[in-house]
Amino acid sequence: MNVSTAGKWSGPALAVLGLLVAGAMALTPAAGRSTLIWWILSSALAPERVLPLIGLGAALALVDRRYSLGALALFGGGVAVGFFGKDWLLSVLAAIPRATSHHFLTGPISSVTVGVALVLPTARLRSWFLLIAAALAGCMLAIAIAVTDPSLHDVAIPLAGVVVGFWIVVAISLTVRTFWRTWFPIPARILGSWLVAIGLLYGGASLIPKQKSAFPLPAESTPNIIPFPGPDRLSPEFQPHERPGAVIPPADLQQP
């Protein structure tokens, strides 16, 4: 196997290798999982995190290699900006209503931006917008890693999140290039429209406040007591009877 053949199949090999590692993590007994493995399975590989990265990888395969490498570099730069400018970015995103309870809407923002890059009609417009989408997706990935990090100080978790993100983008991009067909832009636009729709629906649902119940709940201090019916409302078998004993005779029968 020569170098060109090995490079051609590097994408599928990278994808299979990553899937095997993820499968081994998923098969690990829950009691034996470390914090890192638990975080990778529950956060780094969460659908809202993976879908925009899959779309970004597909978008990189649709453009010229020069733009693809530039977008990948901007993706890495966006990750760095997201980590070092985390406090400022969080303060900006916190202005969005209810963003703090939905990971600062990092998933919807990435999905919509990458989806737009996929559905743009012309290759030139797609290539230029992809640079912006890649940088923004990198920023959102870094913010998502920071706000879901349970350790707060363990370097392994942010590093693993970045590695997983780059693995998804690069593996998808190289695999699509390996099996490239001229009709690939059609399903890519369908994927982009799905990402835009998912991002808008999820983001819109996150902005809607929870509706209060139309029926007020009873106060806890008010006991639910059913009054016991009086004697006149009891059935005959439950009516009170006089106790047996001496009975006073009528006055006309009493002896003097």
Protein language model features and the residues they cover:
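Short, solvent-exposed mixed-charge patches
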Residues: Q254-P256
